């Protein structure tokens, strides 16, 4: 399994509340600044943030941008569905995550989220339903 496949599999399980693979691939000293919350997050913080936000988000297709022994770059698409909260239509974003490794474990990562004014599933060969 590649680093990208392992990363995606770990977080897909995490989105469902199973963080066992996440725990195995992250370094105990992992830290990351979370721009959504404004905090320097450790792994436990990331789990809480993910669990909370996943209630209104669908994480779609992932694509590997770059992978080496010490670095992974991945892109994914996100559908944010606030209809149950405020009745609004879903919106979409593209995320790029840079993942840094130390001794084979994830030590740091940064995610940049870019809003989209279109539904990416209409332009690519996948459907949101495949990821819900």
Where are these regions (language model features)?
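C-terminal and inter-domain tail/linker signature
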Residues: 1-132
């Amino acid at each position: 399994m590649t680093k990208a496949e392992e990363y995606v599999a770990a977080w897909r399980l995490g989105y469902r509340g199973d963080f066992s693979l996440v725990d195995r691939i992250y370094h105990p000293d992992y830290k990351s600044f979370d721009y959504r919350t404004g905090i320097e997050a450790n792994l436990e913080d990331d789990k809480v943030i993910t669990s909370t936000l996943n209630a209104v988000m669908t994480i779609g297709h992932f694509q590997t941008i770059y992978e080496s022994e010490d670095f992974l770059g991945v892109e994914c698409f996100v559908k944010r569905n606030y209809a149950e909260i405020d009745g609004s239509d879903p919106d979409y974003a593209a995320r790029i995550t840079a993942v840094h490794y130390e001794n084979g474990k994830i030590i740091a990562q940064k995610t940049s989220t870019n809003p989209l004014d279109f539904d990416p599933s209409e332009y690519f060969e996948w459907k949101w339903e495949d990821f819900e």
